[in-house]
Amino acid sequence: MGERFFRNEMPEFVPEDLSGEEETVTECKDSLTKLLSLPYKSFSEKLHRYALSIKDKVVWETWERSGKRVRDYNLYTGVLGTAYLLFKSYQVTRNEDDLKLCLENVEACDVASRDSERVTFICGYAGVCALGAVAAKCLGDDQLYDRYLARFRGIRLPSDLPYELLYGRAGYLWACLFLNKHIGQESISSERMRSVVEEIFRAGRQLGNKGTCPLMYEWHGKRYWGAAHGLAGIMNVLMHTELEPDEIKDVKGTLSYMIQNRFPSGNYLSSEGSKSDRLVHWCHGAPGVALTLVKAAQVYNTKEFVEAAMEAGEVVWSRGLLKRVGICHGISGNTYVFLSLYRLTRNPKYLYRAKAFASFLLDKSEKLISEGQMHGGDRPFSLFEGIGGMAYMLLDMNDPTQALFPGYEL
């Protein structure tokens, strides 16, 4: 178990130096504690500079170095992830050059994905069209906006499409929600979205059990619980939609089942029946479930979900300092748990913990990767596996009350 994460030896709390100047924080034992002592404004400015330098490196490695050719188009590991990072940079800095470069990336992804049968936001053509439409609207390019929106509306879902987030109906539905949030409700009609919601409930009830877990789904023969392929991801998307009373009851019942059947450690199973308490990732384990429980706490305002979200956060603090940098199964993704809990509770403890995980990355990740003690990711510049996701998270910490896990929180 210990091989997957670094032991978290960071203090439970480090008070900020009230002088407000980075140069005055000099009496600390080490560089990590010095970062933790910085006032948040100084700290976020430091993160901001570092994030923009990483963004430039990601653009070079994934876009310019290849001669602007796209082999892998998707948001998870490909060039669309670079486009999304550029869009985040534009949102934070208002630098239109980033927005224009974002659209340049999207257009290349559009060409590369034209024959793709994948229809989700993170791993499919829906992500290309959705991000393209939103970025074009921000730039004021009405012709391009209309083109991407029309292409999105032209997407048809295969009858054998699974239900999970990365490749299934939940992932398509998330793309619809993303569009409606950024360009206006009913951009994608409620009727169209409702038909997808109903199909997700129909399938989930077939495999579920009213007395235990009302909704259940399979992906490649396994009944996953996590954010990427399982219950947490599907419930998260459903809670962003208008549901009928019986549907709300089933979502709440499914989440309660997961809480009641988690590991004694507080971590969550990767799949139904699993006895292996190893994974503390966004994709599998407590981090992704925590984000879903925060959403449940916001929507249903019940003590059960608030407490369970905070308990999942304790697992992440204890075992979430992973030996990877990315957002899917790395420290950057786990940092979002604390940002989400801070948004829910406004408890400064969670902002400190987000600051601590980000400080660890800022202070140690380059050295640990170069020494082989930390993994830079199979696709080291990508949004979900590599430093692209780290840059995105660091930019998000500019305003922690608005920080949202990309492709998951809305």
Curated annotation (Swiss-Prot):
The keyword Metal-binding applies. InterPro entries: 6hp_glycosidase-like_sf, LANC-like, LanC-like_prot_euk. One of its GO terms (molecular function) is metal ion binding. Keywords: Abscisic acid signaling pathway, Metal-binding, Zinc. Zn(2+) binds at residues 283, 328-329. May interact (via C-terminus) with GPA1. Belongs to the LanC-like protein family. This is LanC-like protein GCR2. It comes from Arabidopsis thaliana.
